[in-house]
């Protein structure tokens, strides 16, 4: 039975179009027997912003403050959750040409040298291998494959850096460019999601 981790990152709650799309995928994959864990990074599972104290604590050590130990334990749990699943589904709405802060916080908690990647004499090597990722990215305008789409290249780089190179991307494009464009963008995204198997 396939295990799936879903990361929601929209700040828009019930108005979120990326959440609408990922919920469509969740329903489809649950019907196929997948075990799905949902982490709502902008809702009930919001993470702290990584500051200097936390960043230092994530390196470990014998003399951590209580806050550093708490954040290290949280990071370890997030990494364990990531490694325990077969497929990672990431929602990435475009906010001012970038990913939501809440998603970047998760990345900062799981991107750890010696834990999810390592440096070798031949360069960096990812330690989270044998996984698949699905990116669901929504945006108000039309940015796919253009110079204003920084989201997909960034997330593919991050995922590849930690060892996840099997990445599929589903786009919800031009969602704020009028009712017809919205309907078309959502419909095309759902068709792409329907083509994915768990």
UniProtKB/Swiss-Prot annotation:
Source organism: Shewanella sp. (strain ANA-3)
The protein's role, per its UniProt record: Quinone reductase that provides resistance to thiol-specific stress caused by electrophilic quinones. Also exhibits azoreductase activity. Catalyzes the reductive cleavage of the azo bond in aromatic azo compounds to the corresponding amines.
Swiss-Prot/TrEMBL cofactor(s): FMN
Reactions that this protein is recorded to catalyse: 2 a quinone + NADH + H(+) = 2 a 1,4-benzosemiquinone + NAD(+); N,N-dimethyl-1,4-phenylenediamine + anthranilate + 2 NAD(+) = 2-(4-dimethylaminophenyl)diazenylbenzoate + 2 NADH + 2 H(+)
CC cofactor note: Binds 1 FMN per subunit.
Sorted UniProt keywords: Flavoprotein, FMN, NAD, Oxidoreductase
Family as reported in the entry's similarity comment: Belongs to the azoreductase type 1 family.
Name of the molecule in the record: FMN-dependent NADH:quinone oxidoreductase
Binding residues for FMN: 10, 16-18, 94-97, 138-141
Superkingdom of the source species: Bacteria
InterPro entries documented for this protein: Flavodoxin_fold, Flavoprotein-like_sf, FMN-dep_NADH:Q_OxRdtase_AzoR1, NADH:quinone_OxRdtase_FMN_depd
First-tier enzyme category under EC: oxidoreductase
């Amino acid at each position: 039975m396939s295990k799936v981790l879903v990361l929601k990152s929209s700040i828009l709650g019930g108005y979120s179009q990326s959440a609408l799309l990922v919920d469509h995928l969740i329903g489809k994959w649950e019907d196929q027997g997948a075990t799905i864990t949902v982490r709502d990074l902008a809702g009930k599972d919001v993470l702290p912003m990584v500051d200097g104290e936390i960043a230092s604590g994530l390196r470990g050590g014998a003399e951590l403050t209580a806050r550093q130990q708490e954040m290290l334990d949280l990071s370890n749990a997030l990494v364990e959750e990531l490694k325990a699943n077969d497929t990672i589904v990431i929602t990435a709405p475009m906010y001012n040409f970038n990913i939501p802060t809440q998603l970047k916080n998760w990345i900062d908690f799981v991107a750890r040298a010696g834990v999810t990647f390592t440096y070798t004499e031949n360069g960096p090597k990812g330690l989270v291998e044998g996984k698949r990722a699905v990116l669901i990215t929504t945006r108000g305008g039309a940015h796919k494959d253009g110079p204003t789409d920084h989201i997909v290249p960034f997330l593919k780089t991050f995922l590849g850096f930690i060892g996840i190179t099997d990445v599929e991307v589903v786009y919800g494009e031009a969602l704020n460019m009028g009712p017809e464009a919205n309907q078309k963008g959502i419909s095309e995204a759902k068709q792409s999601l329907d083509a994915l198997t768990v």
